[in-house]
Amino acid sequence: MTEQKQIDPITLTVIWNTMLSIADELGTTLRHTAFSEGVREGDDFSTALFNSDALMVAQGNFSPGHLGAMPTCVKHALNYFPADLLQPGDSILLNDSFMGSGHFPDTFQIMPVFIETRLVGFVACSAHQVDMGGAAPGSQKVHGVTESFQEGLRLLPVRLVRGGNIEEDIMRIILGNVRMPEKVRGDLLAQHTANLTAAERLRELFRDYGTDTVEAAYELILNRSEQAMREALSKVPAGLYSFEDYLDDYGPGTEPIKMAVDITFNGKGDVE
């Protein structure tokens, strides 16, 4: 890490655990305010915190299925809305599978966090919506579907909330294309509310410890995580490892989909 500021181990541990607690509170808020059973009872959602460079620094202890895609979704959102165009209270919404969302029912919301005018990070959450339109209720029909346009409403990154105010025009477009608009609206607003809670907690952390200290902790967390992963990979004997498996077919008369991967380990913690 670039030694901008030294952090003692106790302070680092407190900051790190606070970030994890914020990510967990984000999810708890989402669960308690959601309208749909899938989110309230099925825990089909994920939460995370990101630094100002959109690198994940903390995860909530919820569904891991969305977390692998979340960094990609955040980066795509920022390609559409660069940091210098964002303002406090904004929220970016997307569900595009080509940008990382698993399928159209999975909506991601990303909120920038500012200390005065300085961007200090992002909070983000995903939630599986009960319906996003398409050929069948639930927006997961496979039989007879030949293209993504039949699957449901595809949302490229849009600013659902601008400066703390819901963009009702965008909300109406979404709700006009789903089968259960009350639950979808409720869950979208629950995601926004949960992000608001997490954003305030993150601002409190920065106020308590100072911007330089928390940003230095960000970097230490990332470096230590990388070091731990490289140490684990270095224990794998050098060589080429191959694996293949099959996904389910995608409808009547179709074959299972083969997935194959080759990974080369050099015995020093690097992979190809």
Q: Can you describe what each PLM-predicted range is?
A:
Residues S52-Q59, G65, P71-D96:
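Regulatory sensory and allosteric helical modules in signal-transduction proteins
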Residues D106-E116, A124:
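A short, hydrophobic, proline-anchored segment that marks a local hinge/packing element in signaling
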Residues E200-E272:
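Accessory "access/gating" subregions that flank catalytic or transport cores
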Residues T18-G42, L78, P82, L94-G100:
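Short, basic/aromatic recognition patches
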Residues T2-V14, R154-M229:
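N-terminal leader/propeptide and maturation segments of large enzyme subunits in energy/redox metabolism
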Residues L119-N177:
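Gly/Pro-rich active-site capping loops and adjacent beta-alpha segments
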Residues T47-N51:
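Short hydrophobic alpha-helical segments used for membrane anchoring or interfacial signaling
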Residues E41-D44, P105-T107:
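Short, small/polar residue-rich loop motifs at catalytic or cofactor-binding pockets
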